[in-house]
Amino acid sequence: MIRRYLVERVRDRFNDRAAGQQPIQRSDNALLPPDSVAWRVHGDVTTMMVGGIAALLVEMLHPLALGGVWDHSKVASDQLGRLRMTARFIAITTYGERDQAKAAIERVRMVHSHVVGTLPDGRAYRADDPHLLNWIHVAGSIHFLDAWRRFGEPQMTMADQDRYFAEVAGIAEALGGTEVPKSRSAAEEFVAAVRSELQTDDRTRQFRDLVLKAPAARKSEAPVQALVMAAAVDLMPAWARAMHGLRRPPLSTPAVRLATLGTARTLRWAFSGGPR
């Protein structure tokens, strides 16, 4: 009963049952094969939540990326909807049937083609800009991978880390990215090169607070949500925390990591009893 309850709570979080959404079924005919590193990294609920929040906060330090999200999404009113959309896209392109994944990619490309605008300072942005696509992809990949390494596979080899970047680069290229980094070192070099483009302003601070101070969907979920947020801030690089004006979690870092590891192991146990 406990196992079923935990599984249903997670499925409700990531699938809009009112809209008829069901969990993505794993297929042997996916874009990425079952023995890929990405299948390991993207299959853990806790680390994907932690990595996803950390990635989002880092990604939005780029003013052009933030502009597109701020002006064209319901970031303030529907954060759960945005979380579901991102999680389902990753699940479909990792585990779903090949045709299903390709259709999801085409839908995103269509949406991106209409996301254009101008920042308050006059700079133009567009969501299908290959440079911005690479930034979002690389920041996300680094943090998903690092969350998995911290709480799931701390002894992962550098060869497997490089394999992961090479595997997921194909998704970024299908979305319109060019010269997408295909190794850990290439990804880190890309981030270092982009750092000069990052900045914070009132929008960034508002976005940070919308993410980190969002109320839990249910009171019973508030402690876990607070833990995920603390673990995400802890996972971020020091320079990104500093730009956001964030400090290490109020709880000691070892306590946050231990509690997050416990949560991850509990959910792995819950999902080990049947299909995800």
Each model region followed by its residue ranges:
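Mature, function-bearing regions of proteins
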Residues: M1-W135, I142-R276
